[in-house]
């Protein structure tokens, strides 16, 4: 029980700080919490329910689970849990599984197509239900892995933003767990004995690139525990004058009347091995350390 309280306090603090730093929740919001049956979404729902009890503003939560027609998906497991919480919920059924099987060649990972179809269903449901925000359970490790995946395989410096507006302009997506470490989320979900539904019921091949990046981060973290925190910290501490983005350089030059590259300090890359710092960085910063 003591472990549960310790983990809950830590996760509540991280979630509250992310909500405050990025203005994720507003007075009167009706937030759809996408609950897949995994550790991340269960934890997110629990934390938002706890924060709502003590928040200085009023907002509503509605949990939504989507049965995509995967063979053996135990929708009753998720529904029983949601019912036990007393939270308003809605169970959706859309057969996107057959669509994915038709579109994706055998042996290829189905996750990207499946994710896009699921997102479309949730977006439409949010509008129908009058929800102002959609909360997803992506945590710190997801953001850091995505940063490396984008840089290594797509040649772009980007990750998952803490909030965004959908392309059709109808929905705002928020990620309140963006400061929370996966290890803390996993430990909390296990301690709470959430009824986890496996995510591989469809038989999909895993995202091998993401698994490789996850292994790389695990190896680096074993040598230097602050690696993941430092990478998240880097997402909130961009130094444009030390990058090669010409469009960004032009925008800064037009705004300031100065050449950012000529104003850059002459710094050599140093392998100091020191953490960037702990705690929360304000003004859209990120948490350093673990």
Swiss-Prot record:
PANTHER family: AMINOTRAN_5 DOMAIN-CONTAINING PROTEIN, SULFURTRANSFERASE-RELATED. InterPro entries: Rossmann-like_a/b/a_fold (IPR014729), TilS/TtcA_N (IPR011063), tRNA_Cyd_32_2_STrfase (IPR012089), tRNA_thiolation_TtcA_Ctu1 (IPR035107). Catalyzes the ATP-dependent 2-thiolation of cytidine in position 32 of tRNA, to form 2-thiocytidine (s(2)C32). The sulfur atoms are provided by the cysteine/cysteine desulfurase (IscS) system. The thiolation reaction likely consists of two steps: a first activation step by ATP to form an adenylated intermediate of the target base of tRNA, and a second nucleophilic substitution step of the sulfur (S) atom supplied by the hydrosulfide attached to the Fe-S cluster. [4Fe-4S] cluster binds at residues 111, 114, 202. Belongs to the TtcA family. CDD domains: TtcA-like (cd24138). The gene is ttcA. One of its GO terms (biological process) is tRNA modification. Residues 262-273 have a biased composition (Acidic residues). Its EC number is 2.8.1.-. Its cofactor is Mg(2+); [4Fe-4S] cluster. Homodimer. One of its GO terms (cellular component) is cytoplasm. This is tRNA-cytidine(32) 2-sulfurtransferase. Gene3D superfamilies: HUPs. It catalyses: cytidine(32) in tRNA + S-sulfanyl-L-cysteinyl-[cysteine desulfurase] + AH2 + ATP = 2-thiocytidine(32) in tRNA + L-cysteinyl-[cysteine desulfurase] + A + AMP + diphosphate + H(+). It is found in: Cytoplasm.
């Amino acid at each position: 029980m003591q472990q549960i309280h310790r983990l809950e306090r830590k996760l509540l603090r991280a979630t509250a700080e992310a909500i405050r730093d990025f203005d994720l929740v507003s007075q009167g919001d009706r937030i759809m919490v996408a609950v897949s049956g995994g550790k991340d979404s269960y934890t997110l729902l629990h934390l938002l329910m706890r924060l709502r009890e003590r928040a200085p503003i009023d907002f509503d939560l509605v949990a939504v689970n989507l049965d995509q027609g995967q063979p053996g998906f135990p929708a009753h497991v998720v529904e029983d849990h949601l019912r036990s919480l007393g939270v308003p919920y809605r169970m959706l059924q859309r057969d996107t599984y057959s669509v994915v099987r038709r579109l994706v060649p055998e042996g290829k990972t189905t996750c990207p197509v499946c994710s896009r179809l699921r997102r479309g269903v949730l977006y439409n449901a949010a509008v129908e239900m009058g929800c102002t925000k959609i909360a997803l359970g992506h945590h710190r490790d997801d953001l850091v892995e995505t940063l490396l995946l984008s840089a290594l395989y797509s040649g772009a410096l980007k990750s998952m933003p803490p909030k965004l507006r959908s392309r059709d302009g109808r929905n705002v997506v928020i990620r309140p767990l963006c400061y929370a470490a996966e290890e803390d989320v996993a430990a909390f979900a296990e301690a709470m004995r959430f009824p986890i539904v496996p995510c591989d019921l469809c038989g999909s091949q895993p995202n091998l690139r993401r698994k490789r990046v996850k292994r790389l981060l695990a190896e680096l973290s074993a040598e230097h525990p602050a690696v993941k925190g430092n990478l998240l910290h880097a997402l909130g501490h961009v130094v444009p004058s030390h990058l090669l983005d010409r469009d960004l350089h032009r925008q800064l030059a037009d705004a300031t009347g100065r050449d950012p590259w000529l104003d850059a300090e002459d710094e050599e890359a140093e392998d100091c091995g020191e953490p960037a710092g702990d705690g929360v960085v304000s003004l859209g910063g990120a948490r350093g350390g673990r």
